[in-house]
Amino acid sequence: MSLKIKSKITIGVLLIIFLLSIIFTLENVSLAQTSPQISVYKVVGSADLSNPGSAGYWSQIPWTNISLTANIPMAPTSGLTHYLLVKAAWNGSWIFILEEWQAPEPAFNAWSTAVAGIYPNASGPGLFRMIELTPGTTYSLERNYTNYVSIINGKEETGRIVFNYSGITLPAPNNTEITVMSNGTILLWHSPRPVEDLLYNDGMFYGYYVNSTWYYPDRAAIMWYLGSGVPTKDDMNIGGKYPGQQFDGITFKDAGGSLAQSGGSANIWMWVSGATWNNSTYDPAFKSNIWQNESLTGLSYVDSGNHGFAVPLYTNNTNMYEVDTAGIWYTPVASEGLNGSLFFIWTGAKYENGSWVVEFARPLSVPLDYQPFMPNITVGKTYYVAFAVWQGRLGETLFDKSITSSFLSLELVTTPPTSTTTSTSPVTTISSAIPPVTLYVTIIGVVVALVALVILYVVFRR
């Protein structure tokens, strides 16, 4: 082997080693420089859930402006909330998270469909979902299906409804009910979860129907990732009631509400204006005193103090579950134990100046029985959280919502909030996309790699 060839090989090896060392160095710099996107400040005091956001320490903590996006980009009723303001604090034993978002039309007096299902006297908006099909969708009634019954504009007909949109046909299940409005718009009543998935995949889901007297409750949710590593997906699957469900001749691979992040699980705190608000005027569940009635809830405990709460949910790659033994919204995660779990996460809420203000409060530590389904929150650990908001009066409900596009990092910090901030705290805007430091480091790494490749090409071409 000539000296010239040996020199080329030596230079090539050295350049590769140099390139790898640069990449690893940049990766370490990226990790070292990345700070939490949401800081949970150490404070003295407790939450005042009767007037959320009124505790003195909140005025010392700046808002974090979190961008939200449509969960269903093609639906005009999805992604109606463009940003969410968030503050967070802890006092040594509890964590407090304060949220505020604009809501031009609050959904007062709308039932949570699940809660209405356990209360025989429920009446008013929100009792069930109605889907508005995409404009241009038509239907036909196939009368050769003599064992099918369809309801069209309140009239029972023998036959099967078949929807058609841009040449795509979708046969409807037995007992489907539709209303055809004067402009040709088709409304689908009492939509089962699998049907919603089919409509979505065929481009026929336009949104949930609302009018001045029919709408859905407002909601806000925080998702806490429980898996290992850094999650890359914060969305949930649209599908059947359970994985592998056979519905009308179709098999649904995923359950609706199951976590899309492979191998992961998450705890969700869900506040619902029509179920967990603790407002006897505008929350029909509290107006009906449901959470003090064990015969209705199927629980062996009641809402102590009748305070507001957030529904604790648990999702994994299999399904969505409710962290209690009754299963009002979803299948219960356990058949016994979990005493008090449904009301473990406290909330306070108010509507003022065109915005919702909702405060979540939860003990940092959770009982042993809860631990597989809820996080213990400690200093020194990074948590990954995601946020969602529903504007029910405008048609958002279930999987139609405004969400963060990815998880955000959250940490408890031991320093108190700065004393220089005031009640008009500055707003820090963050996007749930790639953090800036990571983005810069990635760009630098790509440039270095390209330069190294050019040098290698020149050396070996000679």
UniProtKB/Swiss-Prot annotation:
Query: Its GO CC terms?
Result: plasma membrane
SMART domains named among the record's database cross-references: EB_dh
UniProt membrane topology term? Multi-pass membrane protein
* Cofactors named for this entry: heme
- What is the predominant subcellular site recorded for this chain? membrane
Q: Topological domain, Cytoplasmic: which ranges?
A: 1-8, 457-462
- Maturation and modification: N-glycosylated on at least seven Asn residues by identical hexasaccharide units composed of Man, GlcNAc, Glc and 6-deoxy-6-sulfoglucose residues in the molar ration of 2:2:1:1.
User: What's a GO biological-process term for it?
Assistant: electron transport chain
Glycan-modified residues: 28, 65, 91, 121, 144, 164, 174, 183, 211, 278-279, 293, 316, 339, 353, 376
Family annotation (InterPro entries): Cyt-c552/DMSO_Rdtase_haem-bd, Cyt_b558/566_suA
The compartments listed are: Cell membrane
Where, if anywhere, are coiled coils annotated? Answer: none
What's one GO MF term for it? heme binding
**UniProt remark on cofactor binding:** Binds 1 heme group per subunit.
Pfam families of this UniProt entry?
Answer: EB_dh (PF09459)
Q: Does the keyword Transmembrane apply?
A: yes
Q: What does this protein do?
A: Monoheme cytochrome whose physiological function is not yet clear.
Q: Which NCBIfam families match?
A: sulfolob_CbsA (TIGR03154)
Please identify the protein, giving its name as recorded.
Cytochrome b558/566 subunit A
Q: What is the lineage of its organism?
A: Archaea, Thermoproteota, Thermoprotei, Sulfolobales, Sulfolobaceae
